């Protein structure tokens, strides 16, 4: 039997919507990254963007295990002397853009390079329950019911 290689023109991309309310962040990110890469498909080809378009709603209601809300810190430097800054995970989730927490968690699970950047463009994250993609008729994927450990 000959090895199957999918061509970009043959790829059928689906739209899926995932509700992040009460779902553990790392488990959600790992499932979303698998979907974005297309590894859930039997026709997976590593060098082709064949993953789904993923919409995540209620990003501000994602859960973290342990004491990560208070203890996990993110650092950056402004470039000026003494310009090191930091925020806790709790500050990021209660700040202006809570969806960035999920975006970064997924981005760090996707391969780095041009294909990974293309696959990240297929991810849309919204802080609230509404999204503007109803016309695509997205299929609902319930991550919380896949495994009892996924939900808190």
UniProtKB/Swiss-Prot annotation:
Listed A to Z, the keywords are: Ribonucleoprotein, Ribosomal protein
Q: Which residues cross the membrane?
A: none
Q: Which InterPro entries match?
A: Ribosomal_uL13 (IPR005822), Ribosomal_uL13_bac-type (IPR005823), Ribosomal_uL13_sf (IPR036899)
User: A Pfam family in this protein?
Assistant: Ribosomal_L13
Q: Single Gene Ontology BP term?
A: translation
- Matching Gene3D superfamilies, A to Z? Ribosomal protein L13 (3.90.1180.10)
Q: Name one GO cellular component term.
A: cytosolic large ribosomal subunit
Q: Does the keyword Secreted apply?
A: no
| One term of GO molecular function | structural constituent of ribosome
- Region of interest: Disordered: 132-152
The keyword Kinase belongs to this UniProt entry's keyword annotation:
no
Q: NCBIfam families from the xrefs?
A: rplM_bact
Q: Which family does it belong to?
A: Belongs to the universal ribosomal protein uL13 family.
Complexes and interactors: Part of the 50S ribosomal subunit.
Q: What does this protein do?
A: This protein is one of the early assembly proteins of the 50S ribosomal subunit, although it is not seen to bind rRNA by itself. It is important during the early stages of 50S assembly.
Please state what the protein is called.
Answer: Large ribosomal subunit protein uL13
Q: State the organism named in the record.
A: Paramagnetospirillum magneticum (strain ATCC 700264 / AMB-1) (Magnetospirillum magneticum)
